[in-house]
Regions:
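Low-complexity intrinsically disordered segments
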Residues: 73-137
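A charged amphipathic helix-loop-strand protein-protein interaction module that recurs
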Residues: 54-84
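N-terminal domain-onset segments
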Residues: 1-63
Length: 137
């Protein structure tokens, strides 16, 4: 059950960082898929322009695995559209993330909308879409 999945404080912080980067990029109309790698001592944000979702995921896999054991966590973020139960489309930032040493990764989301030319994030009681297998080598 999605409601039973638990996200660590570290992954929650990484999700918030990824969403903040999505908001900045979308507000400047320069949104491209990107990868956040948590590597000591700080982190790295890599833009991942790609022709398809498959190409994006393949490139992210390469970069995550190339980082080896130094990669503590990662987040792959992109702009997409989800649908409410009614079928109504709603724009959302999608973030797949995982932390080394944890059995589960997650695909999470944050809805947004444009109001009077400003991007506003819409709060939702559950941000988790599904469990995901971590992409570590």
């Amino acid at each position: 059950m999605i409601d039973e999945l638990q996200v660590s404080a570290e992954l929650s912080d990484l999700f918030d960082l990824a969403i903040n980067e999505c908001v900045k990029a979308r507000r400047s109309h320069a949104m491209h898929p990107f990868l956040v790698l948590q590597v000591p001592p700080g982190g790295e944000i890599v833009s991942l322009p790609a022709d398809s979702t498959e190409a994006l995921i393949a490139r992210a896999n390469e970069l995550i695995r190339a980082g080896g054991s130094g990669v503590r966590a990662y987040a792959i973020a992109y702009d997409s559209t989800l649908r409410y139960e009614t079928g109504e489309p709603v724009p959302a930032f999608i973030v797949e993330l995982a932390e080394r040493g944890c059995a589960d990764g997650f695909v999470m989301f944050h809805h947004y909308e444009w109001i009077d030319g400003e991007l506003d994030l819409i709060q939702h009681p559950s941000r988790i879409l599904q469990r995901a297998d971590p992409r570590f080598a």
